[in-house]
């Protein structure tokens, strides 16, 4: 009997040891927030199809083991709605989690209020209730500037720790500069505007930029336009149709592969467009795309 009890005690201790090793691995949840806009409260914005990206991205994420996916489209993707989604994601996240965030919609350059940009302009995501021009209904508070986004991502990084990963995919365009004139085909849908959101008044003289401790993959370079492909975002279409080929590759190799696809006859549009990779790179995307 004593021998049996010792054996049971030994097995229980062994199981407890195994559980302490296994549980931390199981705790690494794959979480995502996917935002897409094809409608805007202010009808001055051009019609795009960012909302059509969302179901495609969700299917891709589910195929890669993501179990916690929040989506916001059109009227639900207000500034407050997006901020709430960020805060909820931060509250739910745990050490070591794998995070995917995507924004598909309009982008715009807006007045840099804290002086951290050399050109005096911040990049901003455009929520449903943001206006194209400064007005009484939107004095800039409805835009989601890159400074605000960085604050949420910094909090998220603190929550998941260095062992976690954050990938931010931006299928938008912030510039829409004079190269727009090169696109004479009215059937080409462009995500981006050539109007800066100008906030009157004095700005802070200077401020340091926060460290980007996450990976950002954008649909185009700062000076380029983002053209849609077959009614969805070009970057989104390429990701959902090619991610299986990204498994096990470095972020730079994945970027190179995406850039090469951009140049194929199938995707090459009337104006030049190349993706942009920035921030904390290494093997972030290979952890996102890990199912063969």
Enumerate the language-model features and the residues they cover.
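Short hotspots in intrinsically disordered terminal tails
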Residues: 1-2, 289
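Bacterial N-terminal signal peptides that target proteins for export
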Residues: 2-12
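Cysteine endopeptidase catalytic domains of the caspase/legumain-like
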Residues: 18-292
């Amino acid at each position: 009997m004593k021998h049996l009890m010792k054996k049971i005690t030994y097995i229980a201790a062994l199981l407890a040891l195994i559980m302490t090793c296994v549980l931390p691995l199981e705790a690494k949840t794959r979480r995502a927030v996917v935002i897409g806009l094809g409608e805007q409260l202010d009808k001055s914005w051009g019609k795009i199809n960012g909302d059509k990206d969302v179901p495609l991205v969700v299917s891709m994420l589910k195929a890669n083991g993501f179990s916690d996916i929040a989506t916001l489209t059109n009227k639900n993707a207000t500034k407050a709605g997006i901020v709430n989604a960020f805060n909820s994601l931060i509250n739910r996240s745990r050490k070591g989690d794998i995070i995917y965030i995507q924004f598909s919609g309009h982008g715009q350059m807006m007045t840099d209020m804290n002086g951290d940009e050399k050109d005096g302009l911040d990049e901003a995501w455009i929520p449903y209730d943001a206006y194209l021009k400064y007005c009484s209904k939107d004095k800039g508070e409805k835009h989601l500037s890159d400074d605000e986004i960085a604050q949420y991502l910094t909090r998220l990084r603190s929550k998941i720790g260095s062992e976690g990963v954050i990938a931010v995919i931006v299928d938008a365009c912030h510039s829409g500069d004079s190269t727009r004139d090169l696109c004479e085909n009215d059937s080409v849908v462009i995500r981006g505007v050539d109007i800066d959101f100008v906030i009157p008044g004095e700005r802070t003289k200077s401020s340091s930029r926060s460290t980007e401790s996450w990976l950002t993959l954008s649909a185009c370079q700062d000076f380029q336009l983002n053209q849609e492909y077959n009614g969805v975002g070009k970057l989104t279409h390429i990701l959902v149709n090619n991610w299986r080929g990204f498994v096990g590759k470095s972020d730079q190799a994945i970027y190179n592969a995406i850039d090469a696809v951009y140049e194929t006859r199938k995707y090459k549009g009337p104006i030049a467009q190349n993706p942009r990779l920035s921030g904390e790179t290494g093997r972030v995307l290979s952890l996102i795309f890990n199912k063969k």
